[in-house]
Amino acid sequence: MPSHPKLQCLKRSFYEPSASVVALELLGHWLIRNTPEGMCGGVIVETEAYLCDDPACHGAPGLTARNKVLFGEPGHGYVYFIYGCHYCVNAVCQPQGTAEAVLIRALEPVFGEELMRRNRPVSKTRDLTNGPGKLCQAMAIDRKLDGVDLCNPASPLIIAQNPEFNRLRKSLGPVVTTTRIGITRAATLPRRFYLKSSKFVSIKERPTSQTIPSGRTTQKEEDCQPPHSRSRITKP
């Protein structure tokens, strides 16, 4: 897949910190899909963090054939199928061997809206990509992209640096931190993040919401070391 000359992928080192840090940092950058029909994508406005000590993380049960991408090199895409009808795309974080990821929940269309509408016909633009399953349908993201290198400009799916990042974070911020959506395990953990002023956030009203300043975060968490049993691939 040819690379776009004006797009600069986020470096692999960007994804090496904890998913809780990367989830905040991704807000304002671009998720871009390259297809034979053209390019589409937009600004990431909502994310969720899943850490290695998190019962809701797909890596919590250990390494399997289905979740092995989670335990691999940071900066790759982890795509899974849910509810028998939707795909979800995540960015893998932390050094190899530690299963953490950021779920990309919503984005604001910037490129190729017409192409996205062909993939997902809707009457309102807001409904095009305001949810993890919706954005995957609009951008034709499925399990074929599981393991895709998000740091390679020639990949069919990348996360690119937004040259207007600082301005956009100020205009759409501050960042709101809330509990995550649609999970039953560790449901009270405040690990969902979104840009408050974006109209493309999936759900804004949550009882534990709090705002944090826009801009680069300095949040740090202790690294999690996967147990020895996770080094063995088991049946999914």
At which residue positions do the language-model features occur?
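Conserved, well-structured core segments that form or line functional sites
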Residues: 2-224, 228-236
